[in-house]
């Protein structure tokens, strides 16, 4: 029985990064012999086993053959005569097609170490075109490592898009890769890589439509709305925001792509126009409710937060109510954090003060200071309880506004 550490564990060790998960490939064995050795089968589509002691995954060396379009359109062949090199040849990128034997010797038939040192993402072979998920993975690795993409690989990605292969990606897998891409160090690279090969227009047309839409240069020195969206997204990564907040940053200005041409470069009403494309994107990709809801709140109310010092107390109360801020203060904090990224996502404004967060929290604290239970107990006519609670909260917000002013 010969075992090899493969893929990301080898790559990350060579990069000097922490190795979190180790995947193993086994040659010269069968499913029956693996079970006799105490390995527990867990693979549904191909032979994968858990080690009896470490519980790490061990997969029999295998080859694969394309049988239909899309991510699931493959058949696999695993047998004792499948070599390690044959198994590595089916992998996506040279930097992921390396292995180490039990003595720590590197097995590198496709010069992955050389590409790793040069910072290049390069496909292993022509079979790359058979799996559209690989386009998303390349975009994700570009966002993680900042690597460039080999010209031949870029050409293959464009071919896959033109051939319609990406149109067969299942929503769950797109979201899986998108959510990982959003959490990388430079998430904008994920989207620009997809845009450069034409995949963004097929997978996320609502986002792709932002490029080429102008904004007022006095507010947005970057002018282009797509560029602004990427600046905001990268700011959310620098600020260490979570997945829901980063997704909200991506979606916050989707309505600007729908601004009538005669209004440009102004975008009055873009908040309302942004709801439909955001909902469409979320429904199509089956985005989790936490991410969807924060994105919709950000789309609808980011301009309110930017102008919160100017808002009337009754408008502030309505904002807090529609954001469900009294019951969901942590989510409201996420909204505020995304709005700060929006303000900072403009060249020359990265370090600007953003007092709106402190003001919004002051208003929320004022509204929360009202004891709704006491009001309810002291109100004989129970039908007026909501009105009296709102009136008390409005008075508290008015007092806070006077102090802020």
From Swiss-Prot:
Question: What keywords tag this UniProt record?
Answer: ATP-binding, Hydrolase, Magnesium, Metal-binding, Multifunctional enzyme, Nickel, Nucleotide-binding, Nucleotidyltransferase, RNA repair, RNA-binding, Transferase, tRNA processing
The EC number of this protein is 2.7.7.72, 3.1.3.-, 3.1.4.-
One Pfam annotation, family name?
Answer: PolyA_pol_RNAbd
The entry's ATP-binding residues are 8, 11, 91, 137, 140
* Bound cofactor: record note: Magnesium is required for nucleotidyltransferase activity.
User: Which stretches make up the HD domain?
Assistant: 225-326
- The entry's CTP-binding residues are 8, 11, 91, 137, 140
Cofactor list = Mg(2+); Ni(2+)
Record's catalysed reaction(s): a tRNA precursor + 2 CTP + ATP = a tRNA with a 3' CCA end + 3 diphosphate; a tRNA with a 3' CCA end + 2 CTP + ATP = a tRNA with a 3' CCACCA end + 3 diphosphate
Which residues are noted in the entry as Mg(2+)-binding?
Answer: 21, 23
Q: Name one GO molecular function term.
A: CCA tRNA nucleotidyltransferase activity
Similarity annotation: Belongs to the tRNA nucleotidyltransferase/poly(A) polymerase family. Bacterial CCA-adding enzyme type 1 subfamily.
Subunit structure, as described in the record: Monomer. Can also form homodimers and oligomers.
- What's the miscellaneous note? A single active site specifically recognizes both ATP and CTP and is responsible for their addition.
- Swiss-Prot/TrEMBL domain comment: Comprises two domains: an N-terminal domain containing the nucleotidyltransferase activity and a C-terminal HD domain associated with both phosphodiesterase and phosphatase activities.
Q: What is this protein's name?
A: Multifunctional CCA protein
| UniProt lineage | Bacteria, Pseudomonadati, Pseudomonadota, Betaproteobacteria, Neisseriales
């Amino acid at each position: 029985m010969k075992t090899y550490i493969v893929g990301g564990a080898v790559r990350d060790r060579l990069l000097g990064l922490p190795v979190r998960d180790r995947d193993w490939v086994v040659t010269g064995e069968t499913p029956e012999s693996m079970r006799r050795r105490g390995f527990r089968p867990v693979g549904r589509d191909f032979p994968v086993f858990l080690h009896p002691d470490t519980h790490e995954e061990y997969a029999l060396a295998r080859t694969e053959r394309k049988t239909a379009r899309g991510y699931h359109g493959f058949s696999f062949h695993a047998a004792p005569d499948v070599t390690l090199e044959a198994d590595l040849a089916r992998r996506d990128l040279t930097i992921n097609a390396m292995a180490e034997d039990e003595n720590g010797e590197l097995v590198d038939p496709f010069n992955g170490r050389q590409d790793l040192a040069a910072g290049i993402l390069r496909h292993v072979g022509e079979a790359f075109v058979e799996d559209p998920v690989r386009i998303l993975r390349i975009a994700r690795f570009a966002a993680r490592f900042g690597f460039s993409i080999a010209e031949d690989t870029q050409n293959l990605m464009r071919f896959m898009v033109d051939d319609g292969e990406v149109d067969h990606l299942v929503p769950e897998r797109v979201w899986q890769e998108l959510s990982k891409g959003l959490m990388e160090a430079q998430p904008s690279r994920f989207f620009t890589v997809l845009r450069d090969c034409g995949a963004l227009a097929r997978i996320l047309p609502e986002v792709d439509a932002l490029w080429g839409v102008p904004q007022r240069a006095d507010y947005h020195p970057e002018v282009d709305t797509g560029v602004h969206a990427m600046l905001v997204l990268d700011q959310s990564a620098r600020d260490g925001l979570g997945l829901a907040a980063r997704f909200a940053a991506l979606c916050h200005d989707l309505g600007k792509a729908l601004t009538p041409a005669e209004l440009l470069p102004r975008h009055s009403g873009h908040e309302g126009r942004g709801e439909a494309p955001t909902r469409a994107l979320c429904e199509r990709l089956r985005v989790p409710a936490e991410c969807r809801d924060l994105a919709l709140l950000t789309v609808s109310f980011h301009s309110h937060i930017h102008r919160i010092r100017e808002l009337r107390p009754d408008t502030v109360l309505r904002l807090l109510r529609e954001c469900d801020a009294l019951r969901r203060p942590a989510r409201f904090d996420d909204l505020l954090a995304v709005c700060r990224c929006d303000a900072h996502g403009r060249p020359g404004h990265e370090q600007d003060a953003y007092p709106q967060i402190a003001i919004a929290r002051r208003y929320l604290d004022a509204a929360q200071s009202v004891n709704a239970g006491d009001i309810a107990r002291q109100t004989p006519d129970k039908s007026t309880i909501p009105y009296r609670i709102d009136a008390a909260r409005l008075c508290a917000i008015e007092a806070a506004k006077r102090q802020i002013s």
